Amino acid sequence: MQKVVLATGNPGKVRELAQLLADFGLDIVAQTELGVDSAEETGLTFIENAILKARHAAQVTGLPAIADDSGLSVDILGGAPGIYSARYAGENATDQQNLEKLLDTMKDIPDDQRQAQFNCVLVYIRHAEDPTPLVFHGRWPGFIAHKSAGNGGFGYDPIFYIPELGCTAAELTGEQKNAVSHRGQALKMMLDTLRNA
């Protein structure tokens, strides 16, 4: 089994990606288990930040790395919270604080203007100097609900409503979510590419 470092300290992302990669023959190790500090996210896009994180983890560990940069983009807010999704309510904000700030920001926004999408950029980098990192983008459209529903997932999942499923992302099982989510889409693209490489 090939060891690959997962360049995140977010336990929700580690859990989702490890579950999705279990059958692929990759031994996924979270960077925190290897004593790797988080890279500074100085990019202006999900792609830039994912590459920064993957390159940093590969450089420190000497292992191939997978990095994820993802977030929620709300149309009426010009794409916010976007790359700042994890710290929308402040630098050390909890998921609940971020979610509550978004609900408060959108309290007067009518239903027909609550479109949003989760975006996930996954980067696979073979080594720290890799000049051609593999980049995959998944997008999951939905709407921002008026209140939380469900106990699954993490982050904004309890207020991310998927009309065709009639529920929020937090009301899906992990398996259901992985089949349709932005992260599941990006990972499927990555695995298809690695399989055929």
From Swiss-Prot:
Q: Which reaction does it catalyse?
A: XTP + H2O = XMP + diphosphate + H(+); dITP + H2O = dIMP + diphosphate + H(+); ITP + H2O = IMP + diphosphate + H(+)
Q: Which residues form the active site?
A: 69
GO molecular function ontology, one term from the record: nucleotide binding
Superkingdom as given in the UniProt entry: Bacteria
Taken from the UniProt record, the cysteine pairs bridged by disulfide bonds within this chain are none
Q: Which InterPro entries match?
A: dITP/XTP_pyrophosphatase (IPR020922), ITPase-like_fam (IPR029001), RdgB/HAM1 (IPR002637)
Cofactor stoichiometry and binding remark: Binds 1 Mg(2+) ion per subunit.
A Pfam family matched in the record: Ham1p_like
Keyword terms:
Hydrolase, Magnesium, Metal-binding, Nucleotide metabolism, Nucleotide-binding
**GO:BP terms for this protein?**
nucleotide metabolic process; purine nucleoside triphosphate catabolic process
Name the enzyme's class: hydrolase
PANTHER family registered for this protein in UniProt: INOSINE TRIPHOSPHATE PYROPHOSPHATASE, INOSINE TRIPHOSPHATE PYROPHOSPHATASE/HAM1 PROTEIN
How it assembles, according to the record, is: Homodimer.
Per the entry, what this protein does is:
Pyrophosphatase that catalyzes the hydrolysis of nucleoside triphosphates to their monophosphate derivatives, with a high preference for the non-canonical purine nucleotides XTP (xanthosine triphosphate), dITP (deoxyinosine triphosphate) and ITP. Seems to function as a house-cleaning enzyme that removes non-canonical purine nucleotides from the nucleotide pool, thus preventing their incorporation into DNA/RNA and avoiding chromosomal lesions.
- Would you tell me the protein name for this molecule? dITP/XTP pyrophosphatase
Q: Which organism is it from?
A: Photorhabdus laumondii subsp. laumondii (strain DSM 15139 / CIP 105565 / TT01) (Photorhabdus luminescens subsp. laumondii)
